[in-house]
């Protein structure tokens, strides 16, 4: 049976929708990812973020390897119905695979001629300690 709420989302030609993940409380933007219908449905069912991994071509339950799960408080759809916003609690304060709080840790500084990207967030945990495979 088709779920009306899933049909309201404007999925792209690949059946995906962009997702912005924002931390409840701080309002920090933690990451950007994609979901397909199954990922969005699983997110609602679990109360935890589940995305579509374009590189692995499979569902990706955020934190499945690292333990850095995202507990979902709200799911919003933008005015054009083609972008999803998740408001989450980030477990262990690490959202990025680099071991940082946010994937947006590089800030542009300077001007058009001599500007450059500066790292403005510290590594909270070495990724080698996060992603250990037996």
UniProtKB/Swiss-Prot annotation:
Pfam families: PRA-CH
Entry note: cofactor: Binds 1 Mg(2+) ion per subunit. Binds 1 zinc ion per subunit.
Cell compartment(s), UniProt: Cytoplasm
UniProt keyword list: Amino-acid biosynthesis, Cytoplasm, Histidine biosynthesis, Hydrolase, Magnesium, Metal-binding, Zinc
Enzyme class: hydrolase
Superkingdom classification of source: Bacteria
Main location: cytoplasm
GO molecular function: magnesium ion binding; phosphoribosyl-AMP cyclohydrolase activity; zinc ion binding
EC code(s) of this entry: 3.5.4.19
Catalytic activity: 1-(5-phospho-beta-D-ribosyl)-5'-AMP + H2O = 1-(5-phospho-beta-D-ribosyl)-5-[(5-phospho-beta-D-ribosylamino)methylideneamino]imidazole-4-carboxamide
Residues the entry annotates as binding Mg(2+): 78, 80, 82
Signal peptide bounds: none
A GO cellular component annotation in the UniProt record: cytoplasm
Pathway it works in: Amino-acid biosynthesis; L-histidine biosynthesis; L-histidine from 5-phospho-alpha-D-ribose 1-diphosphate: step 3/9
Binding site for Zn(2+): 79, 96, 103
Cofactor(s) the record lists: Mg(2+); Zn(2+)
Family: Belongs to the PRA-CH family.
Function: Catalyzes the hydrolysis of the adenine ring of phosphoribosyl-AMP.
Subunit structure: Homodimer.
Protein name: Phosphoribosyl-AMP cyclohydrolase
Organism annotation: Cupriavidus necator (strain ATCC 17699 / DSM 428 / KCTC 22496 / NCIMB 10442 / H16 / Stanier 337)
Gene name in the database record: hisI
């Amino acid at each position: 049976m088709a779920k009306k709420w899933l049909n309201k989302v404007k999925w792209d030609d690949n059946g995906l929708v962009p997702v912005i993940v924002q931390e409840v409380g701080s309002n920090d933007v933690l990451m950007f990812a994609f979901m397909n219908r199954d990922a969005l449905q699983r997110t609602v069912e679990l109360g935890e973020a589940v995305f579509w991994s374009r590189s692995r071509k499979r569902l990706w339950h955020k934190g499945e390897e690292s333990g850095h799960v995202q507990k979902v408080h709200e799911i919003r759809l933008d005015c054009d119905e083609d972008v999803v916003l998740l408001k989450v609690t980030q477990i262990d304060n690490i959202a990025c695979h680099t071991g940082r709080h946010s994937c947006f840790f590089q800030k542009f500084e300077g001007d058009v001629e001599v500007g450059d990207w500066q790292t403005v967030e510290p590594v909270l945990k070495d990724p080698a300690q996060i992603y250990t495979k037996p």
